[in-house]
């Protein structure tokens, strides 16, 4: 595993531990070069309440690796989280920089009605 990935995972582990101590539902984001994924996970990490990604049927046909696709995923995960009864979440960026696609997803989720 590369040093860059190890440091990202170390940052992610530290923030997830803090979120688990606070016992809050978290919006977890993962990004790859072509896709972006978002999950709303319970405080104990045992259950996924809502999820969305660029691989979903509604979003698969369009471009998947850009900011516009991340915005659509953010709106979709917010809609599904509200349907599951979740309005407040902690944002887990999984060690990725809060910039570009990760930021676009977070902003769209806020627009969709989730409170961070």
UniProtKB/Swiss-Prot annotation:
UniProt cross-references to SUPFAM superfamilies, sorted A to Z: Translational machinery components (SSF53137)
Cystines in this chain: none
Listed GO biological process terms: translation
One Pfam family from the record: Ribosomal_L18p
One cellular component (GO) term of this entry: cytosolic large ribosomal subunit
InterPro entries the UniProt entry points to: Ribosomal_uL18_bac-type, Ribosomal_uL18_bac/euk
GO MF: 5S rRNA binding; structural constituent of ribosome
Keyword terms: Ribonucleoprotein, Ribosomal protein, RNA-binding, rRNA-binding
CDD domains: Ribosomal_L18_L5e
UniProt function note: This is one of the proteins that bind and probably mediate the attachment of the 5S RNA into the large ribosomal subunit, where it forms part of the central protuberance.
Family: Belongs to the universal ribosomal protein uL18 family.
PANTHER family the record matches: 39S RIBOSOMAL PROTEIN L18, MITOCHONDRIAL, LARGE RIBOSOMAL SUBUNIT PROTEIN UL18M
Quaternary structure, from the entry: Part of the 50S ribosomal subunit; part of the 5S rRNA/L5/L18/L25 subcomplex. Contacts the 5S and 23S rRNAs.
NCBIfam families reported in the protein's UniProt record: L18_bact
UniProt-listed HAMAP family: Ribosomal_uL18_B
Protein name, as recorded: Large ribosomal subunit protein uL18
Gene source species: Azotobacter vinelandii (strain DJ / ATCC BAA-1303)
Gene: rplR
């Amino acid at each position: 595993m590369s040093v860059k990935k190890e440091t990202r995972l170390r940052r992610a582990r530290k923030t997830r531990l803090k979120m688990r101590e606070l016992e809050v539902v978290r919006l977890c984001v993962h990004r790859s070069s072509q896709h972006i994924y978002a999950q709303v996970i319970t405080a104990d990490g045992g259950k996924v309440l809502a999820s969305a990604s660029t691989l979903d049927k509604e979003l698969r046909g369009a471009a998947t690796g850009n900011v516009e696709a991340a915005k659509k995923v953010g709106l979709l995960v917010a809609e599904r989280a509200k349907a599951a009864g979740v309005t407040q979440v902690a944002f887990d960026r999984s060690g990725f920089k809060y910039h570009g696609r990760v930021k676009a997803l977070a902003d769209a989720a806020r627009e969709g009605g989730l409170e961070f």
